[in-house]
Curated annotation (Swiss-Prot):
The gene is yipf1. Belongs to the YIP1 family. It is a multi-pass membrane protein. Residues 1-115 are annotated as: Disordered. Keywords: Endosome, Glycoprotein, Golgi apparatus, Membrane, Transmembrane, Transmembrane helix. Glycans are attached at N322, N326, N342. One of its GO terms (biological process) is vesicle-mediated transport. This is Protein YIPF1 homolog. GO terms for molecular function: small GTPase binding. InterPro entries: Yip1_dom (IPR006977), Yip5/YIPF1/YIPF2 (IPR039765). Residues 1-166, 229-232, 277-296 are cytoplasmic. Residues 188-207, 254-255, 318-347 are lumenal.
Length: 347
């Protein structure tokens, strides 16, 4: 039995056969639209699009399979022997500070005084890198040489510095000694001054100390180097400057101890420092002389010892003196004038 719309049946005809109107009424549309209040969505468009989405079949998704790569494969590998050597050097440097370095300019295998192509760099005497080899030492080497300078026997200092003599240690030893001697000298004058208020610092002591110490440490090695060169010995000027610079290291603590205002203590300190440093200097210089020039070597070493003792006496008698000279100015008006006396001759 077909469905009929009985909306208009109140006209008395029960067989009214008007087809059913399947379109929604205005009231139904209003109710459906109320599902989306305060929006711009149209219910008809929403239902139509939803139906189309349900009718669409899902897209075909193929069964993807991924190929696994082995971890042992190096995609950037190069079979050349140079690259293999570079890789080995990078692995060796991985444990060092800074890690691996891809720049060969800073590699440990490249010397500092060479170019990138392996040729030796050339510097002029007025350029700072020209004197770099004079300071090519570290703290450990300098400390070892300072300790050895206070042990005058059982080793050769020239053998220790033969491969790498330096001027770094001697420069700081001499410079420190210049200022310490000047300060100690002024303190001795202050302690033994009768009037501390009128006492003033003597800046000239720094100049005198520099002339004495630098002159002794540069002039005498230069003269000895000329003599040894004339005797065809293998001692270089740099070796002589190095040993004379380290020789005076023991005078640094000795000068500090000379602040003690006791003459006997100061004499003992200066004597010990001069004997230890003098033996260190004489024994090391006499070693290359004793084989072929025994008599000359004894004379040269005697002169070296005498000059070293002279330096110690200058330090003690001039810089570490315990007394200051007090000059008094006499007033000529207060001095009495001599009165003539009558003398008679006895006949």
């Amino acid at each position: 039995m077909s469905n009929y719309n009985n909306k208009h049946h109140d006209d008395g005809n029960p067989f009214y056969n008007e087809p059913i109107n399947t379109s929604p009424t205005q009231q139904q549309q209003q109710q459906q639209q109320n599902l989306f209040p305060n929006t711009n969505i149209d219910y008809n468009d929403y239902t139509q699009n939803r139906g189309q989405q349900q009718q669409q079949q899902p897209a075909y998704q193929p069964d993807l399979q991924f190929q696994s790569f082995s971890h042992d494969v190096d995609v950037n590998s190069n079979t050349s022997p140079n690259n293999n050597n570079n890789n080995n050097s990078n692995n060796n440097n991985s444990n060092k500070i800074g890690g691996n370095s891809s720049n060969n300019k800073f590699s440990d295998n490249v010397p500092l005084n060479t170019n990138e192509d392996g040729t030796e760099k050339k510097y002029s005497f007025y350029e700072v890198p020209y004197y770099r080899f004079l300071f090519n030492v570290d703290t450990k080497e300098v400390g070892l040489r300072l300790i050895r300078s206070m042990l005058p026997i059982k080793f050769s200092f020239f053998n220790l510095i033969r491969e790498n003599p330096d001027l770094y240690g001697p420069f700081w030893v001499l410079t420190s000694l210049v200022f310490i001697v000047a300060v100690t000298s002024n303190l001795n004058e202050y302690f033994h001054s009768s009037d501390h208020k009128s006492w003033e610092v003597d800046i000239q002591k720094i100049v005198y100390s520099a002339i004495t110490i630098y002159g002794y440490s540069f002039v005498i090695p230069l003269i000895l180097w000329g003599i040894f060169k004339w005797m065809n010995l293998g001692l270089r000027l740099l070796d002589m400057l190095c040993i004379y610079g380290y020789t005076l290291f023991i005078f640094v603590p000795a000068s500090i101890l000379c602040v003690i205002p006791l003459q006997l203590v100061q004499w003992i300190i200066v004597a010990i420092a001069s004997i230890v440093s003098g033996l260190f200097l004489v024994t090391n210089i006499f070693t290359p002389l004793k084989e072929d020039f025994t008599k000359r070597g004894l004379i040269i070493c005697a002169v070296i010892g005498a000059l070293h003792i002279g330096l110690a006496l200058v330090l003690k008698l001039y810089f570490f003196a315990n007394s200051t000279e007090n000059f008094t100015i006499s007033d000529s008006s207060s001095t009495p004038t001599p009165t003539p006396t009558n003398t008679t001759k006895l006949l």
